[in-house]
Amino acid sequence: MLDETVRSKYKVVIGLEVHAQMLTESKAYSSDANRYGDAPNTLVSPITLGHPGTLPVMNEKTIEYAIRLGLACSCHISEKQYFARKNYFYPDLPKGYQITQDKTPICTGGQLIIRDKDGNEKPVRLTRIHMEEDAGKSIHDIDVYDTLVDLNRAGVPLLEIVTEPDIESSQEAYNYLTEVRKLVRYLDICDGNMEEGSLRCDANISVMLKDATEFGTKVEVKNMNSIRNVQRAIEFEISRQIETLENGGTLSQETRAFDALKGITVSLRTKEAANDYRYFPEPDLPPLHIHQADIDKVQASMPPLPRALFEKYTQTLNLSEYDAYNLTDSKAIALYFEQVILHTSNYKAAANWIMGEVKSYLNEQGIEIEAFPIDALRLAGLINLINEGKVSNTIAAQRIFPAMLTSAESAIAIAESLDLIQTTDNNAVEAAIKLVLDSNPAEVARYKNGEKQLIGFFMGQFMKASGGKVDPKTANQALRNALEQ
């Protein structure tokens, strides 16, 4: 474990490169299907395999998705771009090159704002967002002796999101990746599943003494299949680099892989320079021209974004930052909440129900909100039933909500059928209080002798006697009045 005093001497500098597979029906430059989970090497064609004489055709949806992400990150959308070939030889790259954007990325600049657990915000600047195609996948753990190659992924369209070196800790990297995943899901351009490889991250990490004027030696870390593993890999690499320098060693610019089982990084190769890839213009694709009308069309179709919803919930609906952050963590949850508040003005209650009972049920059943059996209108009806004083929150949660999970009836219909509507009949309230007090004379005497905490006992007995059909606040006050006589 690295001593905190030693660590505090150094500044950590991190830049992240995120590759997001786009949710298009077909691949970037061919009509091959873009799907995950099919049998190996079944989603390929002569174009994917790089056969002589085949020509790429641009998938226009990838341009729309790139613009969508660029707008969400306040990037500059380039008017004219050229494509390039990135050349290298590897078994899972049948063409021997990837089509990418080298000197003219579709998006430049921009930023993504991250939040820490205390609500503090920090902008992470973006260098660029560019389009490219994915390589195939080498599989090392099926055959003992051979590496197998699946080319289904080859040619899948990617967006590479490159940050400036603004990230200063593993926790900030975690927060940034969480925001990226949330954003691409809101935009419907990537499913964000790191476990399936549709969102991948490479981290460039260096350390420098706090009074130094030049960055330290950069090390790239790959092979991280979850946001948590990115955080673990960065944390290990920071400690490794500082310990090496403190022991008088030197660092090499290299690429390292993260071993999730051991929690360490291991050296893969000396880091390549850009000229090692021999970039040159892609001769088979014309320049891409993007006009303001194209950008305006995408802008008009943009969905609500998490930051805008967060500001709406905190500033307009007066929800806490905690509630707003949790509601916007999932696009589907946020959209469900939006539907609920169309039918009720008690925004806080709507948030509480969704983050409480609704999410608990989803977690217990292992389902998403899309499969939740209570639609937004019916949940709003339940909330309104409580607001109107017709049922208590306890009765709603314990009796009506469970019944709604297995019925298509409204909350009011279920409450009436189960005889749960709260009574306002004073005679019935007085009769229930008399029954409770007459049945518990010893507890009444103790209460009158100063054991005021027994009010909880009397409340429990009263709610049983009344069948929970009296407003708890009304019942509490009526009980206190009777006990003080």
Model regions: which residues?
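Extended, structured, electrostatic nucleic-acid-contact surfaces
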Residues: 307-314
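Amphipathic alpha-helical segments in well-ordered regions
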Residues: 69, 237, 340, 353, ...
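Core structural elements
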Residues: 197-209, 314-336, 347-364, 377-379, ...
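Short, amphipathic C-terminal "tail helix"
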Residues: 452-485
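Basic, nucleic-acid-interacting segments
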Residues: 1-304, 321, 342-346
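Structural motif
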Residues: 318-319, 341-350, 388-391, 449-452
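Extended hydrophobic-aromatic, low-complexity segments
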Residues: 288-289, 324, 336-338, 349-350, ...
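Strongly charged, low-complexity linkers/loops
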Residues: 370-380, 390-464
